[in-house]
Regions:
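Feature captures the FAD/FMN-dependent oxidoreductase FAD-binding
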Residues: 79, 141, 146-150, 198-247, ...
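FAD-site-proximal beta/loop scaffold in flavoenzymes
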Residues: 251-282, 374-444
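Phosphate-coordination loops involved in phosphoryl transfer and adenosine-cofactor binding
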Residues: 143-146, 214, 281-284, 350, ...
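A short, basic/flexible loop-to-alpha-helix module at the beginning of a structural domain
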Residues: 31, 128-147, 263-283
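C-terminal catalytic lobe of FAD-dependent flavoproteins
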Residues: 13, 24-38, 42-46, 361-413, ...
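Beta1-alpha1 glycine-rich phosphate/pyrophosphate-binding loop at the start
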Residues: 5-33, 62-74, 79-84, 88, ...
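Local cysteine-cluster metal-coordination motifs and their immediate loop/turn environment
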Residues: 45-67, 89-111
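A conserved FAD-binding loop/helix module that cradles the flavin
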Residues: 294-299, 304, 440-468
Length: 485
């Protein structure tokens, strides 16, 4: 283990510092500054190398966290990245974007602040790229089998890389003009700059993975054509159908889904031309939804120069500390101050949106009421209505499932009652040879779950093609996080 008394010597949890707010809202660069090596080493040394490391079960990938904490404490960065890559294809994604359920399961977190696992993880991969320790791993021989992966988000990329490395010829189909899916166009650069995606794609190309951009499966090429052309097809199209709010005034000009705001904004940052971009400069903005997507809209609006930004959440403000009904090692719901919240804006809880109001077809405000709980339901309380002035509203209410994209009509793939592509215990749909991984089959979830499912689905595909597999399968389709709502 690392320092046997490290958790006693260093009791303070010291996370990665953020750049000053007045500086960072003037650009789109990542908000975090580098952490000093000595601080990082001390934080890694707080790991107790538990006999039963609950951080493993908290992470869907089963990351070998105590092992690479120990290696960082011993200044063995090259060995650390080998242990990290053994379970995680893309630690630069999870190290920046994951809410770190592993830290919620850290044994030290029972009576001290948890180990800064996420920060150690991202430092390992950043150091590895800087020192040239990340290299292509092409297969020694080809199997002669072909696989099409549809969608280039975290699940699709993980599945493609795993299948390529065991010798299958893999082609990734992406309807957008660049690879990355959610990572490319859904996540603002201030959370993760896109060079992180680009260099992984280059690694995958050197390993032999092929990429087909600008191809919409279901229209440009049918699912049936893919199934005939390839020995297996993996559906990794994500859960992209946004949850709507069908209340009076929904059709007013100025009410938009969050992704209709974020995707063009990310394209502009990438230097791509965008027509009729939704821009928040000088506008009064209201965001409905208090999750990560809402925070992404908030940070983007700050950088656009919004006059004001208010986030409305229908539920109660979460507690600052773990509630009694969410005991360790479950993943708790906590009040958090993301970088975007630190930059400004107001957050209002127990706010039920009842109507979008406007004049001449344009949004002028949002009518809200206080939320009351009746028979377990959240309802607007009569007599508490008020109108908040607004020029723009962004609906960041989550996603309800995968887009059909012709998959039912063309290959008879079925959907479950939650809007996800149905699959069996081996990630296969009801159509033989067509598999599904990530949010398309699981529903809206975390990037770390998408990568884990991509890896596990790759193992299932490899076994389907070859009769056996050496690929790891960290999760089953029915696995869920340990949580109490």
């Amino acid at each position: 283990m690392a320092d046997p008394r490290g958790f006693l010597k260093v009791r303070q949890r010291e996370t990665q510092p953020r750049r000053p707010v007045p500086v960072r809202i003037m650009d789109w660069k990542e908000v975090y500054e580098a952490q000093e090596k000595g601080v990082l080493k001390a934080q890694a040394g707080r790991c107790m190398d538990c006999g039963v490391p609950f951080c493993h079960q908290g992470c869907p990938l089963g990351n070998l966290i105590p092992e690479w904490n120990d290696l960082i404490w011993r200044d063995k960065g090259e060995e650390a990245i080998e242990r990290l890559h053994a379970t995680n294809n893309f630690p630069e994604f999870t190290g920046r974007l994951c809410p770190a359920p592993c830290e919620a399961s850290c044994v030290l977190g029972i009576n001290q602040p948890a180990v800064t696992i996420k920060q150690v993880e991202v430092s390992i991969i950043d150091q590895a790229f800087e020192n040239g320790w990340v290299n292509p791993l092409p297969p020694a021989r080809l199997t002669g089998k072909t696989v099409a992966v549809v969608g280039s988000g975290p699940a699709g990329l993980a599945a493609a890389q795993q299948l390529t490395r065991v010798g299958h010829t893999v082609a990734v189909y992406e309807r957008d003009d660049r690879i990355g899916g959610l990572l490319r166009y859904g996540i603002p650069d201030f959370k993760m700059e896109k060079e992180q995606v680009d260099r992984r794609v280059e690694q995958m190309k050197e390993e032999g993975t092929r990429f087909r951009t600008g191809v919409a499966v279901g229209t440009d090429v049918t699912w049936e054509q893919l199934r005939r052309r390839y020995d297996a097809v993996v559906v990794c199209t994500g859960a992209t159908v946004p949850r709507d709010l069908p209340i009076p005034g929904r059709g007013l000009d100025g009410v938009h889904f969050a992704m209709d705001y974020l995707v063009p904004a990310n394209r502009v940052v990438a230097g791509e031309p965008v027509e009729n971009q939704i821009h928040a400069k000088g506008k009064h903005v209201i965001i409905l939804g208090g999750g990560d997507t809402g925070a992404d809209c908030l940070g983007t609006a700050h950088r656009h120069g919004a006059a004001s930004v208010t986030t409305l959440a229908i539920g109660k403000q979460p507690p600052a500390e773990r509630a009694g009904h969410q005991p360790w090692p479950t993943f708790p719901t906590l009040f958090e101050v993301a970088s975007a919240h630190e930059e400004g804006g107001e957050r209002t809880y127990l706010a039920s949106t009842v109507e979008f109001v406007g004049e001449n077809g344009k949004l002028t405000g949002v009518k809200v009421a206080e939320t009351e709980f009746v028979d377990g339901k959240r309802l607007p309380q009569a007599g508490t209505e008020r109108i908040i002035p607004a020029d723009l509203v962004f609906l960041a209410l989550g996603f309800t499932g995968a887009e059909p994209a012709g998959i039912t009509e063309q290959v008879s793939a079925e959907f479950d009652g939650r809007g996800n592509v149905s699959r069996d215990g081996y990630y296969m749909t009801n159509t033989e040879g067509i598999f599904v991984a990530g949010d398309a089959g699981r529903g809206q979830s975390l990037i770390v779950w998408a990568i884990a499912e991509g890896r596990a689905c790759a193992a299932a595909v490899d076994k389907f093609l070859m009769g056996s597999t050496i690929l790891p399968a960290p999760v089953a389709p029915t696995d869920r996080a340990i949580a109490v709502l």
